[in-house]
From Swiss-Prot:
Pfam family, one: GTP_EFTU
Keyword Protein biosynthesis (UniProt): yes
Principal location class: cytoplasm
Record-level Gene Ontology MF annotations: GTP binding; GTPase activity; translation initiation factor activity
Region of interest (G5), ranges: 447-449
Region (G3): 357-360
UniProt-listed PANTHER family: TR-TYPE G DOMAIN-CONTAINING PROTEIN, TRANSLATION INITIATION FACTOR IF-2-RELATED
InterPro entries referenced in this protein's UniProt entry, alphabetically: DNA-bd_dom_put_sf, EF-G-like_DII, IF2_II, IF2_N, P-loop_NTPase, Small_GTP-bd, T_Tr_GTP-bd_dom, TF_IF2_bacterial-like
Ranges of compositional bias, category Basic residues: 156-167
Protein name, as recorded: Translation initiation factor IF-2
G1: region residues: 311-318
Family of this protein: Belongs to the TRAFAC class translation factor GTPase superfamily. Classic translation factor GTPase family. IF-2 subfamily.
Region annotation (G4) ranges: 411-414
Length: 803
C-alpha cells in the first residue's frame, strides 16, 4: 500500500482528521499534523491498537436492563373469591458487538480493513445510548400502567445471575406451579457460562474481518462437450441442479437431473443463466491419429480430373455419360432416371477423366452436394428444349458453394424445338455468363443421342483441368471419400470410395467414419477386381464392419487396434448426441400436443438398396408431414427386407416399403400370414405419390357448405302441438325438408338448427321451389318473427389431398 497523508487516510476510513490524530497519539505514533505522511508500519501499529482497545472495551461493556411486571386479578368460584398475583421479570443483556451487527447494514462495497476498525468504537457508543433510551422509555410506560409498583432504574453490572425472591406460602398452588415453570424458563435463559470458557462476544469482535460480498454476479466460461447431463452442467456453473432444471422449465423443456442434453440446448441454458458457453469437441483420439499420420510426403504428380455431371431430371446426364463410356448405363436405372451416384473412370484419346453421375430428382439434394464437394469440375447439363429448371439452379448453387468451375453442356440440340440461345439468356440471370458474352463459363452444344459436340466437350473439360493444375501424391497411405454405400447379399457392406491421394491396396486397414475394416476385395468401375487404386480412381471396397455414411472421409490407418478404438469412440459419441436430441425433441412434442388434438401418424419401415437413396427417401418422406398428419419412419436401413423388419411393423402397425430391395421367402410367408402391408418400389416418384395418397386418407374430412334456398317469413301462426309455424315465401332456390337451416334477422344469424316440418296447403311436402308459399316449422325454436329469413343449406364432403 502506498504512503498517504493523515487527511487522505481520514477520508478513506470516513472519519475526521482530528479524531484520527487522537487515535494515532493513543497508539504511540508520533504524528501531530494532518498533512504528515503515514507509513505502512504506522498504519499496522494503529490497527493493532484499535483491535486491542476495542476487544477490551467490548468484553467489559455490556448493556443490562431488568424489567419487572406484576399483574393482580380475582378469580371467583361460587361464593369464594381468590386473589391472584402474577409477577414476571425479564432481563435484557446485549453485547455491544451484537447491537452493532443488528443496527449496521451489510456493506455493499469492499473497503480497507482500517476503515471498519477505526469507526467501531464510535458506532458502538451511539448504539448503546440508543438502546438505553429505548429501554428507559419502555420502563416509564410500565410505570404508568402500574403506579403502585416501585420503579427500578436499569443498572449495569457484572454478569451474575439475579435470583428471584421466594414466593410466600400463602399463594395458591396454581400460582406456584405457574411461577415455578416461569422460573425454570428464566434459569435456562440466564444460565451462567463457566469461567474458563472464552467470551463469544469478545471472540466475535476479535474475528471481525473486512470481507464484503461480491457486488456483481460471477460470470463463468462453461466448457460444453457434445452431450452433458444436467447434474454435470450444474456443477460446471457452480449452481444447484434444481436451478438448472428450473431454467430449462422456463425455456419449455422438462428434464431430470441425470438426463443428457445436447450441446446446443446446454449452450442456451448457460446463456440464460448469465454465463458464457464454450463449445468443445472431444476429438483427442482423432487429433492423435492425424498427428500420427502426419502430412503425406512425396512428389505430387498430375492426376485425372474428377468431373461431376449435374442438372435437372431427364435432361440427359446419364445419356451423355453413356455415350462417352459406350455402354448402356441408362437401361439399368429404373424408370430411366439415375437414383445413385455412379463413379466411372473413362480413358479417352485426350486423357483420363473420372466422372460422377448424380441424380437430378429434387429428393437427391444431399447426393448432389456430395458430388460437388469431391469434384474438380462441374458439367452442367441443360436440355435445349426444356430450359433452366429448379434442379439446374440448385446445381449452380452447389458448384458455387464448392468453388469449382462450371462447364455448361446444352444437350438435345438435335431436336427441332431446341433453342441454345434461350439457354444462355436464362443462365445469365443466375450469373452464369458465356465466354462470348464476356463471362468465364464455357458453353458447348451437344447431342447425347447422335454424339454431336461430345469430343469438343471433352476437350474443354481437359483444358479446364490443365488450367487448374491438378496434382496429388500417388504413394503412401491412401485417403479418399465415400461416394456411395450399400449392403450386398453375399458380399456384405460395399462402399464406393473415390481415392483423392495416396494409393489404396488390398489388405489395408480402412477407417471410414464410424466403420472400419480390412480391405478384402476391390472392384473397379468396370466390374473387374483390382489390387490397388491411385488418385482420382473410384473403387468398390469390401470388408468394412458396416455400411458407412455417404460423404465420410476414408483414411488408411497403420494399426487395426487404433482404427477399432476410434470407430467405437465415434459410435459412442454419435449415440449420445442422437439420444440427447431425440429426448429433447420428444419432450418438445409433449408440450406441442398439450393444446392440440391427436395427430394421425403413418408408421413406415423403410429399406433401400444404397445409403444415398435411403437418405434421400427419408428426407423426402419427412417433408410430407403436416400439422394434421405425420410420417414416422420407425426404422430404416440398407439391404433386403428381413423377418425382424416385418415383426417390427406388426408391433407398431407400420407399412413396410422396399426401394429396389425384396423380401426373402420366409419373410414373405410371415407377411402373408400376418397381413402386413408390404410395398415394393423402384422409382422414387411412385413411392412419394403412394405415401401422399396414404396420408391424404388419414386427413380429417372437410365439409363445404352450399346454400340451397332462402325463404322470407311473411306471417307467424301458433300451433299447440308444434309451436310457431312460419308462413314463408321461397325467394331463392329450393327449400327441402330435414336440411340444416339458419334463421337470419337483419342479416345476422340468430339461430342454427334443423327444419322440422314443411307444409303446403296442410300437406307435408318434401321440397318447395322458388316463388311458392309454404309453412315451415323450425325444430326447438319458437321465436320466429315476421321479416326473418330462413336460409337452407347442405354440407358436402371435400376430398383432401397432401400438397
Amino acid at each position: 500500500m502506498a504512503d498517504m497523508s493523515v487527511k487522505q487516510l481520514a477520508d478513506l476510513v470516513r472519519t475526521t482528521p482530528e479524531r484520527l490524530l487522537e487515535q494515532l497519539k493513543e497508539a504511540g505514533v508520533a504524528i501531530t499534523h494532518v498533512d504528515q505522511t503515514i507509513s505502512d508500519e504506522e498504519k499496522r501499529k494503529l490497527l493493532l491498537h484499535l483491535k486491542t482497545s476495542h476487544s477490551t472495551e467490548t468484553g467489559k461493556k455490556r448493556s443490562k436492563i431488568v424489567l419487572k411486571r406484576k399483574k393482580l386479578s380475582v378469580v371467583k368460584s361460587g361464593k369464594k373469591s381468590v386473589n391472584v398475583e402474577i409477577r414476571s421479570k425479564r432481563t435484557y443483556t446485549k453485547p455491544v458487538v451484537e447491537q452493532k451487527r443488528e443496527t449496521e447494514p451489510a456493506p455493499t462495497q469492499e473497503v480497507p480493513l482500517t476503515s471498519d476498525t477505526t469507526n467501531l468504537n464510535e458506532k458502538a457508543e451511539v448504539n448503546v445510548a440508543t438502546l438505553e433510551k429505548a429501554v428507559e422509555a419502555e420502563v416509564k410506560e410500565e410505570a404508568k400502567k402500574t403506579p403502585s409498583e416501585k420503579k427500578e432504574t436499569p443498572k449495569k453490572g457484572p454478569r451474575k445471575e439475579t435470583r428471584r425472591s421466594r414466593k410466600p406460602d400463602k399463594e395458591d398452588k396454581w400460582e406456584r406451579e405457574e411461577l415455578h415453570m416461569t422460573k425454570l424458563v428464566e434459569e435456562r435463559r440466564r444460565r451462567h457460562k463457566p469461567a474458563h470458557m472464552p467470551d463469544s462476544d469478545n471472540a466475535s469482535a476479535k474475528l471481525e474481518q473486512g470481507f464484503a460480498r461480491p457486488t456483481a454476479p460471477v460470470v463463468r466460461e462453461v466448457a460444453l462437450p457434445e452431450s452433458i447431463t444436467v447434474a454435470d452442467l450444474a456443477q460446471k456453473m457452480s449452481v444447484k441442479a434444481a436451478e438448472v432444471i428450473k431454467a430449462m422449465m422456463k425455456l419449455g423443456a422438462m428434464v431430470t437431473i441425470n438426463q443428457r442434453i445436447d450441446q446446443e440446448t446446454a449452450a442456451i441454458v448457460v446463456e440464460e443463466m448469465g454465463h458464457k458457453p464454450k463449445l468443445i469437441k472431444e476429438d483427442v483420439l482423432e487429433e492423435n491419429l492425424v498427428a500420427t499420420l502426419g502430412e503425406q510426403t512425396g512428389e505430387a504428380v498430375p492426376r485425372a480430373p474428377v468431373v461431376t455431371i449435374m442438372g435437372h431430371v431427364d435432361h440427359g446426364k446419364t445419356s451423355l455419360l453413356d455415350y462417352i463410356r459406350r455402354t448402356k448405363v441408362t437401361s439399368t436405372e429404373a424408370g430411366g432416371i439415375t437414383q445413385h451416384i455412379g463413379a466411372y473412370h473413362v480413358e479417352t484419346e485426350l486423357g483420363m477423366i473420372t466422372f460422377l453421375d448424380t441424380p437430378g430428382h429434387e429428393a437427391f439434394t444431399a447426393m448432389r452436394a456430395r458430388g460437388a464437394k469431391c469434384t474438380d469440375i462441374v458439367v452442367l447439363v441443360v436440355a435445349a428444349d426444356d430450359g433452366v429448371m429448379p434442379q439446374t439452379v440448385e446445381a449452380i448453387q452447389h458448384a458455387r458453394a464448392a468453388k469449382v468451375p462450371v462447364v455448361v453442356a446444352v444437350n438435345k440440340i438435335d431436336k427441332p424445338e431446341a433453342d441454345p440461345e434461350r439457354i444462355k439468356t436464362e443462365l445469365s440471370t443466375h450469373d452464369v455468363l458465356p465466354e462470348e458474352w464476356g463471362g468465364d463459363t464455357m458453353f458447348q452444344p451437344i447431342s447425347a443421342k447422335t454424339g454431336e459436340g461430345i469430343d469438343a466437350l471433352l476437350e474443354r473439360i481437359l483444358l479446364q483441368a490443365e488450367v487448374l493444375e491438378l496434382k496429388a501424391v500417388d504413394n503412401g497411405p491412401a485417403r479418399g471419400m465415400v461416394v456411395e454405400s450399400r449392403l450386398d447379399r453375399g458380399r456384405g457392406p460395399v462402399a464406393t470410395v473415390l481415392v483423392t491421394s495416396g494409393e489404396l491396396h488390398l489388405g489395408d486397414i480402412l477407417l471410414v467414419g464410424r466403420e472400419y475394416g480390412r480391405v478384402r476385395a476391390m472392384i473397379g468401375d468396370d466390374g473387374r477386381p483390382c489390387e490397388s487404386a491411385g488418385p482420382s480412381m473410384p473403387v468398390e471396397v469390401l470388408g468394412l464392419s458396416g455400411t458407412p455414411v455417404a460423404g465420410e472421409e476414408a483414411i488408411v490407418v497403420p494399426d487395426e487396434r487404433k482404427a477399432r478404438e476410434i470407430a467405437r469412440f465415434r459410435q459412442g459419441k454419435y449415440r449420445e448426441v442422437r439420444l440427447a436430441k431425440k429426448q429433447t425433441a420428444h419432450l418438445e412434442r409433449i408440450f406441442d400436443r398439450m393444446g392440440e388434438g391427436k395427430q394421425n401418424t403413418l408408421n413406415i419401415v423403410l429399406k433401400a438398396d444404397v445409403q444415398g437413396s435411403l437418405e434421400a427417401l427419408t428426407e423426402a418422406l419427412n417433408k410430407l408431414s403436416t400439422d394434421e398428419v405425420k410420417v414416422n419412419i420407425i426404422a430404416s436401413g440398407v439391404g433386403g427386407i428381413t423377418e425382424s423388419d416385418v415383426n417390427l411393423a406388426i408391433a407398431s402397425d407400420a407399412v413396410v416399403i422396399g426401394f429396389n430391395v425384396r423380401a426373402d421367402a420366409p419373410t414373405r410367408v410371415l407377411v402373408e400370414r400376418e397381413g402386413v402391408d408390404l410395398r415394393y418400389y423402384s422409382i422414387i416418384y411412385d413411392l412419394i405419390d403412394e405415401v401422399k395418397k396414404a396420408l391424404s386418407g388419414l386427413l380429417a374430412p372437410e365439409f363445404e357448405e352450399k346454400i340451397v334456398g332462402l325463404a322470407e317469413v311473411r306471417d307467424v301462426f301458433r300451433s299447440s302441438k308444434i309451436g310457431a309455424i312460419a308462413g314463408c315465401m321461397v325467394v331463392e332456390g329450393v327449400v327441402r325438408r330435414h336440411l340444416p337451416i339458419r334463421v337470419l334477422r337483419d342479416n345476422v344469424v340468430i339461430y342454427e338448427g334443423q327444419l322440422e316440418s314443411l307444409r303446403r296447403y296442410k300437406e307435408d311436402v318434401a321440397e318447395v321451389r322458388q316463388g311458392t308459399e309454404c309453412g315451415i316449422g323450425v325444430k326447438n325454436y319458437n321465436d320466429v318473427k315476421v321479416g326473418d329469413q330462413i336460409e337452407v343449406y347442405e354440407k358436402t364432403q371435400v376430398h383432401r389431398t397432401i400438397a
